[in-house]
Amino acid sequence: MGKIVITVGKRKRAIARAVAREGKGRIRINKIPIELIEPKYKRMKLMEPILLAGEEVISQMDIDVTVKGGGVMGQMDAARTAIGKAIVEFTGSKELRDKFLAYDRTLLVSDARRTEPHKPSRSTKGPRAKRQKSYR
């Protein structure tokens, strides 16, 4: 049947699942080809791991990414991480892994920062809201 690799990328509330399989170099985000993603800055962010890996590596695989939750840029970052992980795991190349880490660590490691939960006091204002202190 061929080699199949499944990876996950996360950013804030967005979760992306990438499935890499042997193919001709097609990459789709939520069934949309990566070339048709608009605006351009989102497409360029998604293309970073692909451009770093090179055409000869990408032309051997197809990657399908499904992204859910979060906002627009959170989804792009999650998809980017999932694509980066899928490429490295599919090729099994340590050089490529080191190249990705040297360029940007978030290509392989999900950003662990999450929104801080609201605290009980004055919870509608946010997690750290306090009344302003006056000295006079």
From Swiss-Prot:
**One Pfam family of this chain:** Ribosomal_S9
Q: Which domain of life is it from?
A: Archaea
A GO molecular-function descriptor: structural constituent of ribosome
GO biological process terms held by the UniProt record: maturation of SSU-rRNA from tricistronic rRNA transcript (SSU-rRNA, 5.8S rRNA, LSU-rRNA); translation
What residue range is the signal peptide?
Answer: none
Q: Where do the segments described as Disordered lie?
A: 111-136
Gene3D superfamilies, per this entry? Answer: 3.30.230.10
Which cysteines in this chain are paired by disulphide bridges?
A: none
Q: Which PANTHER family match?
A: RIBOSOMAL PROTEIN S16 (PTHR21569:SF16), RIBOSOMAL PROTEIN S9 (PTHR21569)
Tell me which species this is from: Methanocaldococcus jannaschii (strain ATCC 43067 / DSM 2661 / JAL-1 / JCM 10045 / NBRC 100440)
Q: Which UniProt keywords apply?
A: Ribonucleoprotein, Ribosomal protein
Matching InterPro entries: Ribosomal_Su5_D2-typ_SF (IPR020568), Ribosomal_uS9 (IPR000754), Ribosomal_uS9_archaeal (IPR019958), Ribosomal_uS9_CS (IPR020574), Ribsml_uS5_D2-typ_fold_subgr (IPR014721)
Lineage of source species: Archaea, Methanobacteriati, Methanobacteriota, Methanomada group, Methanococci
Q: Which GO terms describe its cellular component?
A: cytosolic small ribosomal subunit
- Bias category Basic residues: which stretches? 120-136
The family this protein is said to belong to = Belongs to the universal ribosomal protein uS9 family.
Q: What is this protein called?
A: Small ribosomal subunit protein uS9
